[in-house]
Amino acid sequence: MHPRAGASLSRRRFLSLSAGGAVSGAAALSGCALQVSDSVSGGSGDSVTLMVKPEDIAPELIRQCQKDTGITIKTVQQDITKLIAMLTAGNPPDLVRAVGATDTAYFAARDVMEELDPYFAKSGVLKLDDLDPVNDLWRFDGKTQGKGPRYGMAKDFSQDSMYWYNTASFDKAGVDYPAELEPITFEEWLENARRLVRRKNGQTTVFGGTYSGLTRAALLTGLTASAGGSLFDDDFSRVDFTTPEARKALTWYIDFCKAKVGPSLILLDPNGWDGPTYQAGRMAMSNSGYWMGGMINTDEKLAEVSRLAPAPKFAGGPRLSPCQGGTGLWMPRKAKNKDAAWRVFEWFFGEAPAKARAAGGWGIPTLKSLRPLMPARTEYQKRVLKVQENELKHFSVVAFSPYITGDSFDALFNQIAPAAMKGEMSVDALARRLNSVINEQIKRGKEQVA
């Protein structure tokens, strides 16, 4: 199922295309020696078009790219309808943002992504032996994610089942701190959240913890893997929430939501995400990986009482710590200026912007050679880094289906699951209903690929 040169694209094949996630731009880091690319001829006078979100690459970074590479970046607002139109018209952007964990297999299966192995092989900046294993999220061999050709690269990453906790909240509730390097169980995590939550006059004043992941799609596939199973069948053409492992994962998540100890579809956080709530001392545990340290590091008092903890595990299950995002860029197969696009790709993922991201603590760099730039000046930064470095040993790719997007999965789940979270539907009934609607969507996606 590799890309076929000259294959035609139709709108029907992209009816359910969607992409989500966050790619963050960063100001260039001054004073760093840069490796020099010798792989492409893109240079002065060239321009490339990136389909990204406004926050992905700031105007000053665009100016820095022109200064460093001689290439002008033009941006197009990320919009799936516009992307479909550009792809089918044969005039796509030169680089497109996507979420490696849930988008790679979907786009690769539809023959729209350029295989980047030849580019990596010639690059003096992005060397194969320097790539962190998280970049395997951007590989797909026609059947399974994590194997085969490379179609993109993550800009940075976190192991998103890890969590931060506030020691002051634990002290106040008389709850023991989790072990520094060994995981507690999901059952213990939820019990801690029940003890940590604070309510007054029927209102939640301090959330015990949040554990909803970046997307429900990535969360539930990861939870099922942690229970020792797979949410999908062998050829990824069906989900099955009724298997013992998937049911265990689903039950735990519904129990978390029913307990109302943290934000969920039935208990919204007014801030919209964990950062401001955790920063205000109104969240005892935050299911955010290393990347949130970029915010925590800006507040010394908060950093002093914050700890990063390993991803929980199910009792008797394997120890896994996946990445639920791995957001980055891919090159359309019909892009018009591939050499210049690759030069920008190298610059964004391996030169000044990548070094700035690594130094800021907003995610783990996806080049191993950049890890020494991760913040380690203070004692609390050293403590966080110790936990994170140990956790890297437990990373693995949790493959996602090529026949449905993470956004489509989430939309269906979000329509059905609240009834179970409110106690109006049993977990078994929810599992059967999810199987029905998600498998119907997967069936349509498989027909499109065929």
PLM ranges: what are they?
Residues A193-R195, D235-L267, A311:
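Glycine-centered hinge/linker elements that transmit conformational signals in sensory
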Residues Q145, A309-P310, A359-A411, Q415, ...:
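Long, aromatic- and glycine/proline-rich binding clefts that accommodate carbohydrate-like moieties
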Residues M1-V112, K122-L128, A315-P318, T327, ...:
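Conserved N-terminal structural module of periplasmic/extracytoplasmic solute-binding proteins
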Residues D117-P133, A179-E182, K200-G209, G229-K248, ...:
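Short, solvent-exposed loop/beta-turn-alpha elements that line the ligand-binding surface or hinge
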Residues K67, T88-A89, I254-V261, T298-I364, ...:
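Extracytoplasmic/periplasmic substrate-recognition and gating elements
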Residues G142-D156, S161, E187-V239, M283:
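Extracytoplasmic/periplasmic solute-binding protein
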Residues D103-D160, R307-A309:
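Hinge/lid segment of periplasmic solute-binding proteins
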Residues V76-A85, P183-E188, L265-Q279:
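Short helix-initiation/N-cap motifs at beta->coil->alpha
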